[in-house]
Amino acid sequence: FNSPLAESSIIGTAIGLAVTGYKPVVEIQFADYIWTSMMQIRNEVVTMRYRSNNLWECPLIIRAPVGGYINGGIYHSQSIDGYFMHMPGILIAYPSNASDAKGLLKMACRLKDPVIFMEHKGLYRQGYASSLEPDSDYLLPFGKGNIITSGDELTIVAWGAMVHKTIEAIKSLGLDER
C-alpha cells in the first residue's frame, strides 16, 4: 500500500508490520532522506533481537537508492553505506548488476533479519549493469564476494557501481592481460 512521504512513518509502519508477521519491503525514495527515520532504525529495527534475547525478530527490507551520477546535488547523491556498515543487527545488500540484485532481493525476502538494500542510481538503465540470471530460482547468499580477477600484487574491494569503475581501471592499466 502507499504511505505518506515521511520516512520515519514509512519505517515505523514497516516495523509494526514486521513484528506482527508480515514481510514488508519499503522504499526510501532517495537514501539521502533516510536520516529522519534513523531513530526508528537504530533503536527499534536493529536492536529487536538483542532487546528480546533473540525472541523477537523484525524481518523487513528497506530499499534505498544511493549514490550520484545523476546530477542530483546534495539531496539526491549521498552514499549511506559507510554508516550502515558499522551498525550491528542489519544486513546490507549492495549489488553491482541486475542478476545479483534479483538474487540478493529474493534471499532477503527469505531471511528473518532486517536488510538494507542499497541500489546505486548510477546503475539504473545501464547496459553494463545488465546480466543474465543463472536461473529463475537464483538466490545469492549474503556474505559472499565475487572475484573478478585474481593476482598477488593488489586487492581491491568494491561494491555497487564502483565494481564497474574498478573493472574499467583494471582494463585501462592492462592488469586483465596478465
Question: What are these language model-derived features?
Answer:
Residues 6-9, 15-157, 162-165:
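Conserved thiamine diphosphate
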Residues 83, 165-178:
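Short helix-loop-beta junction
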Residues 1-2:
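Short pre-catalytic strand/loop immediately N-terminal to key active-site residues, enriched for Gly-Thr
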